Every structure is written in C-alpha cells, then in structure tokens.
Amino acid sequence: MMSASFHWKHRSNEQGKNPLDKSAMPSSTLHYMSTNNSTNNGTGTSTNTSGSSSHYTIAPRSFSEMVPSQQQQQQNKKRKRYSDDDSETHNETHSENNNDTSQEQFKPHNHRDQTASGLLHLQQQQLQQQHSLLLLQQLHYFHGSSKTKRTKIPKIIGQPLPTSRLIESLDKTHLEKLLHSLIDIHPELNKTIQKITPKPSLENLLLILQDKHAQLIDHLPYKCSETSDYSYLRIKPYLQEFLSCLEDYVLYYLPSNNYSETKHKLIQSLKFIDEATSTIHKLPNFTNSEYQYMRNLTYEQLINCWLILVNQETNCDTGNGLDYTEFHKIVEELDLLESLKQHGVQSGQEGFSKVIEAVQNKLGQNQILLSRQFGIDYGNDMTVSSSNGNRSGTGAGFGGGGGGASRSGSGSGTSSNALSDMITVDYSLYSLSNRSV
C-alpha cells in the first residue's frame, strides 16, 4: 500500500538578518511523501516498490500585503460603523413592530421567570376550563340535555279551569241550565238556594215577563193570519212558558200568612197584577178553541187574585194587616178604580165589575169606621143604615147601572160570596165535541 501525507515545513533564515528583507522572509515548503508497502520477493528481501518525497514551495506574500495600511484600517472602521448604524436602525424598526417577540427572544433565560410564567399559564388554562364547564352546564340547564338538571326544572302540566272561572265564562242561558241540572241531581239544594238568593224586585220580574211576551210575538209567522190555528201552533210552546211564568209570579205576590209582610207587599202586588193583566190584553186573540179556553181561564184566575188582594183584613185594634187610611192611599196612588174599568173593557170579562164593587165596599167600610172612631161626617157621599144587620151603599159600580153593591149578614160584609161568583166560564163550550177545526 501506498500512503501520502503532506507536511508543512518552514525554513527559517539565519538569525541576525533583516526581517524586512524579502529574501530573508520565511518560505514554506510543502512536502509530499508517498510510501509504498514493501513486498516480499520470496527471497527474504523486501524491496521498496515506490517511495519518494516531493517538495512544493509556495511563494510567500510581502509584509505590506499582510499588514493593512492605515487608510485601509480607517476605511474598515468607517464601514464597520456604517454597518453597525444600519443594523441598529433595522433592529429599532423591527423592535417597534414586534416588541414583545424581540424582547422575549433576546431576553436572558431565567429559570424562576419560566416557573412563574408556567404557573400563570396553568392557572389561566384552569380558569378557561372552569368557564367552559359553566357554559356547558348553563346550556344543559336551559335545553334539558342533562339528566341531573331536569329534576330541578318544574314540569308544567295543563290543568282544568277553577270553578269560579268556569262560572264567569257561562252566559245566562248556560248558567240557568247548570243550576237546573244541579237542582235535579241534588233536590236538597232548593231550600239553600231560596235562603241565600236575594228577593227579586218588581222591575226585574216585569222585565222578564215582557221579554217572554216579546219572544212569543217574534215567533208569529209572517204570511199567515195572526189569529189562525197555524199561528197558534207556532207560538204554543212560548205561550205555555209565558203563562207558567205569569202564574208563578202572581202566586209570589199574593199575601201570605205573615202579616208583617202584608203592608209592604200590597202596593207591589197590586202594581204587578195590574201590569200582568195589561200584558194578557196584548196577546193575539186566536180563533182556536183551546186558546180561547186558556185565555178565559187566565182572566178568571187574575180576577180572583184581584179580589184576594182587595179584601185583605184591616184591623187597627190588633195591629195586624193594613191601617184604615193605608188602603185609601194605595187606591188613590194607583188610580185603581180607573185601571179596573179599563181592564173590564179590554178583556170583555164581567168579573172586573165585581172587583170594582169590592174596592168601593172596602173604601166605604173604612170611611164608616173612621167616622165612628173620630166623629167625621162624610155627608151624602156614603149613607149607612143598620137595620137587622143590613148595609147598603150608593156608590156606582162598573157595568151595573149605578145600583151599587149590597151585603147581607150579621155584622160585616164578607168576600167569600164574591170569590164564589167568579167562576163564570161555561166549560161545556170547550168540550171536544164543540171544538172547531
């Protein structure tokens, strides 16, 4: 094998020579040595196949070339200063744009600062995680996606209306049906309702009666005669309802056994029965025999009610019933005699003449009692004769020709005969055989 190596050797000049002399400058020599391995010839001698050394000499530079001149040094300093200024301006502009990054980049490493910043970074991460968890919990709470939060949200379930709200929503018709249904289911509620319900006023009852009469008239046919049988059949249900309502109201205003209510109710009772009789006059006069029978029977019952109200007891000694002067005031206030005359004319019923006689007799009796008690003389207006218990009056009666009214008895006139005389309808005229089709 052959190896090559390079060796630098410096030949130093002799001492004492001028160092500035170019000839005395050191020279460097490059030795190139190549060695070849010896090979055995087989004779026991080794021969150097190739072994030689080559010397290469490099020409040295002059000292002036090696040492820069003063001008070159100054120029180099200027160049260095200019380059330093440029780098500083560049660094300043770069630091203005990226101040934080440059400071962190050129900041000296400090292990304590790194530890504090790491802890701060961890705390910030923990705060962010907690904030994100809170947001998720809020979302679960509002959207109900979390099973644990569903138990905290109250479940809204529909419920029926309270009883008070149901009653508010009902109109008059449905409210009446509800009350009737309750009474049918629980009959014991009748007494409770009558106790707690306020008493109806006269104006309200008259208004209800007029409304029922208006419903009856509104259901009359347009193309047929009002007095025909077809018209009667059309309004028959409404007529029955009207008469039933009238009967209940009349019975309500009749005097009861409680004398304390008699004085208070008499004037209202007379007013109501007067208006009720006028309402009957306004009903169509159907030719149907059934209606004619019902109409005459209604007038007869009203006349009986008139007599019952007129013939109430007047007793000043016991303090029950009406005073003597109270009835006289009521008759004058209501103009009762004139109203009864009009009812007799419009209805064609002779029974109203007996009601007028009863009113006149009642006024005459009161005047006689007052004259006896206070010594008042009424002159020719009233003549009283008491022979064998007979009393006669000279007042004129309706449709009677001025004969007045007479009573016979043992002490005072009674109203039982007048009530018994009120049944004047011949019911044989309304038998099935005599009905007109």
Swiss-Prot record:
Skewed-composition ranges (Basic and acidic residues): 82-97
Pfam families: Cut8
InterPro entries in the cross-refs: Cut8/Sts1_fam (IPR013868), Cut8/Sts1_sf (IPR038422)
Region annotated Disordered, chain positions: 1-110, 385-416
GO biological processes: nuclear protein quality control by the ubiquitin-proteasome system; proteasome localization; protein transport
GO molecular function terms noted in the UniProt entry: proteasome binding
Subcellular location: Cytoplasm; Nucleus
This protein's GO CC annotations: cytoplasm; nuclear membrane
Role this protein plays: Involved in ubiquitin-mediated protein degradation. Regulatory factor in the ubiquitin/proteasome pathway that controls the turnover of proteasome substrates. Targets proteasomes to the nucleus and facilitates the degradation of nuclear proteins.
Subunit structure: Binds the proteasome.
Name of the molecule in the record: Tethering factor for nuclear proteasome STS1
Lineage of source species: Eukaryota, Fungi, Dikarya, Ascomycota, Saccharomycotina
